[in-house]
Amino acid sequence: MTEQKCFLKCIESGFIVSKPLFDNARYDFILDANGKLYRIQVKTSHWTDDTKAAFVFNGYSQHSVGNGNKRMKYTNQEIDYFMTEQDNIFYLYPANEEGFVEKKLRIIPPKSGQVKNISFAKDYVFEEVIKNL
């Protein structure tokens, strides 16, 4: 469901969107924005608690192997951005070199007042990020 919503958001925003023919790509679709192509991996996000102060999404794919599961982090060698949606607001978060297991985006600052090493959702809103691509 999240993938369809993100795909549609990109199209409604006037961008060309392309999907791989098969399931062997690490990205979900290609976003053609301002003459450049960006590999987008869509992830479903969820609130961390009932306060809706922050939400999280996974930065990995999971596959069954033998008698267990294998997690593979996404890196900027495979994708350019993660895209997610929370309460009908869409977000683009850049992939990095080492990857991550889980990313938290805060709507409300922590009660401690800490801002260092905190990622605020407002900095990754789709409409704002896309302007700078």
Task: Give a label for each model feature.
Residues 102-133:
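Charged phosphate-binding loop/patch that engages nucleotide di/tri-phosphates or the phosphate backbone
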Residues 43-90:
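Catalytic cores of nucleic-acid endonucleases
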Residues 11-13, 23-25, 76:
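Residues that act as N-cap/strand-start positions at coil-to-secondary-structure junctions
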Residues 81-114:
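Domain-level recognition of nuclease-like catalytic cores that cleave nucleotide substrates
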Residues 17-25, 34:
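Active-site metal-binding core of divalent-cation-utilizing nuclease and nuclease-like domains
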Residues 1-19:
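Acidic-basic catalytic patches of nuclease active cores, encompassing PD-(D/E)XK
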Residues 36-38, 89:
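Short acidic/polar mixed-charge low-complexity motifs
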Residues 10, 29-31, 38-44:
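Conserved catalytic cores of phosphodiester-cleaving nucleases, focusing on short active-site segments
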